[in-house]
């Protein structure tokens, strides 16, 4: 059995964080950009001669769009929230520069025990998930 893992194409959030004011996306439901659509379409030929038995995709728009551009034909597909990206809780949709100045969240950007929440396996944003939480969610 072969397992293929595909990340969604460039999302509007990816674009915004690169070229506009940066914010935390997490599980916000954002679409693909034109570049993201083109990236997904470029993967389509790779799978022409590969028999795909099942597809599992998160319920977020960016992942469903990526899937539709790669696999436009009928394949048994499971759409599930269990495959969503890590939740960033109260930080989702918030501008990073604004959060960094908010005294209520000071520790998440300045305290060594908390500030690694973006990369740590155990730390998390307030009301969000750690990577450990994601592991157990996906394992279901």
Where do the language-model regions lie?
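Short amphipathic alpha-helical/adjacent loop interface patches that line ligand
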Residues: 40, 138-139
């Amino acid at each position: 059995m072969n397992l293929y893992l595909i990340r969604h194409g460039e999302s509007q959030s990816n674009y915004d964080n690169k070229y506009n004011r940066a914010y935390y996306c997490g599980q916000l439901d954002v679409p693909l950009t034109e570049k993201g659509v083109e990236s997904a379409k470029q993967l389509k030929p790779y799978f022409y001669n590969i028999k795909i038995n099942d597809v599992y995709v998160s319920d977020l728009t960016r992942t469903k769009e990526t899937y539709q551009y790669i696999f436009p034909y009928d394949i048994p597909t499971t759409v599930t929230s269990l495959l969503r990206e890590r939740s960033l809780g109260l930080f989702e949709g918030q501008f990073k520069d604004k959060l960094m100045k908010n005294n209520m969240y000071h520790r998440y950007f300045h305290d060594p025990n908390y500030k690694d929440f973006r990369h740590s396996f155990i730390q998390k944003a307030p009301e969000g998930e750690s990577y450990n939480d994601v592991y157990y969610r996906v394992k279901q």
